Amino acid sequence: MLRLLKRNIQISKRIVFTILKQKAFKGNHPCVPSVCTITYSRFHCLPDTLKSLLPMSSKTTLSMLPQVNIGANSFSAETPVDLKKENETELANISGPHKKSTSTSTRKRARSSKKKATDSVSDKIDESVASYDSSTHLRRSSRSKKPVNYNSSSESESEEQISKATKKVKQKEEEEYVEEVDEKSLKNESSSDEFEPVVPEQLETPISKRRRSRSSAKNLEKESTMNLDDHAPREMFDCLDKPIPWRGRLGYACLNTILRSMKERVFCSRTCRITTIQRDGLESVKQLGTQNVLDLIKLVEWNHNFGIHFMRVSSDLFPFASHAKYGYTLEFAQSHLEEVGKLANKYNHRLTMHPGQYTQIASPREVVVDSAIRDLAYHDEILSRMKLNEQLNKDAVLIIHLGGTFEGKKETLDRFRKNYQRLSDSVKARLVLENDDVSWSVQDLLPLCQELNIPLVLDWHHHNIVPGTLREGSLDLMPLIPTIRETWTRKGITQKQHYSESADPTAISGMKRRAHSDRVFDFPPCDPTMDLMIEAKEKEQAVFELCRRYELQNPPCPLEIMGPEYDQTRDGYYPPGAEKRLTARKRRSRKEEVEEDEK
């Protein structure tokens, strides 16, 4: 808070000591520099006690300059002041007459007198610094990084300004914000509608909304955190009809944590940098892509052996294949991709892809749109070269987000309609839109999907963060489920949805709720015949955890994850020591910390 004050005090000390204690021999006196540079904007912000210590010439010269406001641009102008001639007379009483002393004792007395004089000046400066009231200077606002100027002509006025400012800061901190609306008012509002949502009785996260101050919200979050049991996760959806028995496919995204932890790691996202391409050429990048595809074959085999028949393929399968300068086609990997397709056809294993967040065909920048079109063509080439059967080829969709809102949602939707016509027919057949957790809700995207015949992926976790005109939580969305399903069935594609849960179930703000949990503990109220992508950090372990909780057989939970009495002689893909990966990350880290403390 007082950083600027300390800086000015140090500057004032530096100014005085530059005049009185300079050891360079300039001019006729060893203590007087020929030219002293003083910043006039800093002179005006010095206290009077420090101004009085400066030589008369610098005071008169600087006082005639216009006063500069103390702000962001105040420390820019500097003026040199020639103090050589004037200071000779003013320092005469400090150092004595300017004449050579013939005796040694006389020189010693002169040096001692100069030392006493400079020490007295230093003491005066320290006293003025100690007595300097910080309330009359700048203080830093607790709500922002910009300094607030409370400097005034009198101390009483400055204290009044400080008190007013602190009251304003407290009022801003206690400013009420809409956290949730009252349940009763929502019931009254919803009673007039045709659809009456079912309000869960045991829902720990209130779907109500009421006005709370920021401080009371923090207290509520602390209380809920204290009462939270780590082994009793919150149920996100308390619907009457859970989709059990589950007849669809449960899947995970991109990475298998168990195979990734093996000594010979199996994963499909090896990548590099452009400098590697420039140094080693495209052949080195193609070798990485070949290794990724070979590991994808192992992943499909592993999934089938453990009952999983749905997975998202990593977009990094072939690094920089869609780059504007270093891009390349995939003829060299045709045979390996066909092998993946044969296994998928054999096991009825669904494969999808999800281009990254920078693939935005609604961007106002033409460069971004061109890159997005190339990226979508690259993803389509991967899936097309697998030569999947008719249904699996339809089900091999490309999921994208609409992106930012930029100038406005209406303008962004118009750009999407325009740039959508630039896509190839093959990409159009695979393209799917997903509601996000920042800008675009289900209600924003559903009319566009109906207009352009694009399926809509419903992400339940994103809907809980950006509910649009509906309430967060689930059941208000139920009337739209048939309309969303129709966007899939009219193109003959098996419907899929995304489900995840927040890593912090007690979080209030959307920013804190976006992070995905390690595993999920509930089912959304969806059709049990569709495909459900579990987006959790523990990947396939989250799928097995869900199967264990609900005793599902699609896929069955492996014995390695059921408990301590599993069969260790079972021939599986679990490497020795991988059972540590079968526990949640936070619980595993706590256990390891306890073991280290005991040692």
From Swiss-Prot:
GO terms for cellular component: mitochondrial chromosome; mitochondrion; nucleus. GO terms for molecular function: 5' deoxyribonuclease (pyrimidine dimer) activity; endonuclease activity; heteroduplex DNA loop binding. Residues 97-115, 137-146 have a biased composition (Basic residues). Pfam families: UvdE (PF03851). Keywords: DNA damage, DNA excision, DNA repair, Endonuclease, Hydrolase, Nuclease. InterPro entries: UvdE, Xyl_isomerase-like_sf. It comes from the Eukaryota. Induction: By UV light. Its EC number is 3.-.-.-. It is an enzyme of class 3 (hydrolase). Gene3D superfamilies: Divalent-metal-dependent TIM barrel enzymes. Residues 89-224, 561-599 are annotated as: Disordered. Residues 116-127 have a biased composition (Basic and acidic residues). GO terms for biological process: base-excision repair; mismatch repair; mitochondrial DNA repair; nucleotide-excision repair; pyrimidine dimer repair; UV-damage excision repair. Endonuclease for the repair of UV-irradiated DNA. Involved in the excision of cyclobutane pyrimidine dimers (CPD) and 6-4 pyrimidine pyrimidones (6-4PP) which forms the UV damage repair (UVDR) pathway. Also functions in oxidative damage repair in vivo. Provides back-up AP endonuclease activity to apn2 together with apn1. NCBIfam families: uvde (TIGR00629). Belongs to the uve1/UvsE family. This is UV-damage endonuclease.
